[in-house]
Amino acid sequence: MSYALFDINQPLDFTAHPEAGYDLIVAVNVLHDASHVVQTLRRLKLLLKAGGRLLIVEATERNSVFQLASVGFIEGLSGYRDFRRRDEKPMLTRSAWQEVLVQAGFANELAWPAQESSPLRQHLLVARSPGVNRPDKKAVSRYLQQRFGTG
C-alpha cells in the first residue's frame, strides 16, 4: 500500500503521482474546495488504473449554516471558478456529485445514504474509472509459486 498527498487545484505531477498508478483514491471533505470540480475529477481519473475506484465523502447540504461557519473560515469557500459561481454555493447535493462524476467520465457505483437529503448532512460516494483492470497472469503465477511452491 502506498499513499500520498495531492493538491487538487494544481496540475498533475506524474513524477509524484504515476498515471494509472492507483487502484483507489480516497477524498474526504476536500473536493468541494476544488476551483473547478469536473476538471479536478478528470485529473483524479487519470491517476486511477482502469476500473479503479474514487471514494468520496462530502457534505451535501448546500445551505448548511454549520458547514459555512465551521469550514468556511478555515478553508475558505470562495475559490471556485465553475458552475457554483452562479449561486455562490460551494457545496453540491448528492445528485449533483453524481452528475459531475459522470461528466468527468466516471461510472457511479454507490451513494450512501441513498436518499438525497441525509440527517448526516453528508454522503459517501463511490465511482469507478472506465475499463477493466485485468491481472497479469504471469505475475500472479510467479507470486503463487514463490509463496506456496510448486505443487
Which sequence ranges carry the predicted segments?
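4′-phosphopantetheine-dependent carrier domains
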Residues: M1-G151
